[in-house]
Structure formats: C-alpha cells, structure tokens
Amino acid sequence: MHQFQQDNQYFIFNFDRTFEQATEFFQAEFWQKQERVIGSAKGRGITYFLQTEDWFGVNCALRHYYRGGLWGKLNKDRYRFSALETTRSFAEFHLLQRLYEAGLPVPKPIAARIQKGKLGICYQADILTEKIENAQDLTALLQTQTLPKETWMQIGRLIRKLHDLQICHTDLNAHNILLQQTEQGQKCWLLDFDKCGEKSADFWKVQNLNRLKRSFEKEVGRMNIQFTEQNWADLTSAYHQ
C-alpha cells in the first residue's frame, strides 16, 4: 500500500509504487481517450466501469463523491477537510480493505484520491474499486425472477458477518447487494461503504436490518420486485443462526 502527495492532491494505492498517471486515473476523460470505458451506472453521479485488468489485476469502477439532499443542490461535491484519514474516499478505502482482508465479499479497494481547494479548507474525492464481474444488483434480478431460499439465507449470513465485526452499513438497501453468477452458483456482494464504519453496542443492528426490509418493501411498490415475507424470514433465520 502506498500513500503520497502531488501538489494539492493526496493519493493512496493498493500497490507499493507511485504511478505517473495518478491524477489521470481519477478522470473519466483519460479512460475514454484510452478507450477503456466498458460501461457506466447512474446514481448521484456516473460510476464508470473500466478495463484495467492488465494494469491493476482487476477491472475497476471509478466513482466521484457527490452530496445528496438539499446540501447537494447548494454544494454538489465539496466537503470540509479535517484529517486525511477521515475524508470520504480515504475512509471508505480503509474500511473496504479491512473487510476485504477479513474475507467479506466486498470490492477490493484499488486507489483513492482527494483534491484540496486553494485554501485547503474543502476537498473533492474519488475512489477506484474492483468491478464485480457477471453481477446484477438485487432489485434488477428480482424484477424478473424469484430467488431460491439459499440465496436469501446467504444474504442473511453476509449481513451477520458484517455486524459481528461491528460495522454498520449506513445505506444498507437492496440496490447495494449484488448477485454474481459463478460456476458454483450465486454469490452475494455488498457495495457502497461511503460513510459506513464501526459502531459499538448492538441496538443498531435490528434497526439496520429493518432498514433493509423497508428498502425491499419500497421496491415492491416502485419496481414490482418479487419479495415476500417468507423471503425475509429465510434471510433473518440465517442471520440469527
């Protein structure tokens, strides 16, 4: 792992070297000129999927951090700087690395950057993470098919592993769970650990699960996904084992 500074930019890479193109790696235009953009997804901004296996060992997802809500209308992507390790991209990078090393199915963090403004008070942030191949988010799949009991139980066990590490996923919802098709069957992954972190005690774990259930119920009405109380019972049964 290598952390370094170039002018008003700070980088961390999951490699023991410095890259001359460090700045360009976080610019969509660079990858477009290289003809290495292989897809994209829209959220608050655009996440670009990049062909980088020959450079980084895996293909990557490039994401810029944007604010949501009312603040996002006034200030779309600047955050107040206090310490490097607590910036949005560096904090998510380190949390992903911790979970990855613990064996949880999360994207491997590849690199993160922050760029300070002229006064050094605010910063903008970006992150590069592993792209999970041959995968769809849960809501996309549930619009066209039901899932077997074992898949719901796998999701429950995954969330339990996360909670056993005292990590609270503050945006735990059906869109942040991916299902990957492998030769061994379906594998569940968790995404988007921005603003997530360690939390003491246990009271929040039930609240976290309830948040996930509400997201499923919301998408039943909004996207007509196939989700039942029995699915939830299978998930929570595995969680409590």
UniProtKB/Swiss-Prot annotation:
What are the recorded GO MF terms, alphabetically? ATP binding; kinase activity; phosphotransferase activity, alcohol group as acceptor
Q: How does it sit in the membrane?
A: Peripheral membrane protein
EC number from the UniProt entry: 2.7.1.166
* Reactions that this protein is recorded to catalyse: an alpha-Kdo-(2->6)-lipid IVA + ATP = a 4-O-phospho-alpha-Kdo-(2->6)-lipid IVA + ADP + H(+)
**Principal cellular location given in the protein's record:** membrane
Catalytic residues at 171
Characterize the pH dependence: Optimum pH is 7.5.
Provide the alphabetized UniProt keywords.
ATP-binding, Cell inner membrane, Cell membrane, Kinase, Lipopolysaccharide biosynthesis, Membrane, Nucleotide-binding, Transferase
**Record-linked Pfam families:** Kdo (PF06293)
**Which Gene Ontology BP terms does the record give?**
lipopolysaccharide core region biosynthetic process
Q: Under which pathway is this protein filed?
A: Bacterial outer membrane biogenesis; LPS core biosynthesis
Can you cite an annotated GO cellular component? plasma membrane
Tell me what effect the entry lists for residue 85 to D.
Answer: In strain: I69
Catalytic EC class: transferase
Question: Membrane-crossing residues?
Answer: none
Q: Where in the cell is it found?
A: Cell inner membrane
NCBIfam families recorded for this chain?
PRK01723.1 (NF002475)
- Tell me its family: Belongs to the protein kinase superfamily. KdkA/RfaP family.
Instruction: Report the function annotation for this chain.
Output: Catalyzes the ATP-dependent phosphorylation of the 3-deoxy-D-manno-octulosonic acid (Kdo) residue in Kdo-lipid IV(A) at the 4-OH position. To a lesser extent, can use GTP instead of ATP as substrate.
User: What is this protein's record name?
Assistant: 3-deoxy-D-manno-octulosonic acid kinase
What lineage is this protein's organism placed in? Bacteria, Pseudomonadati, Pseudomonadota, Gammaproteobacteria, Pasteurellales
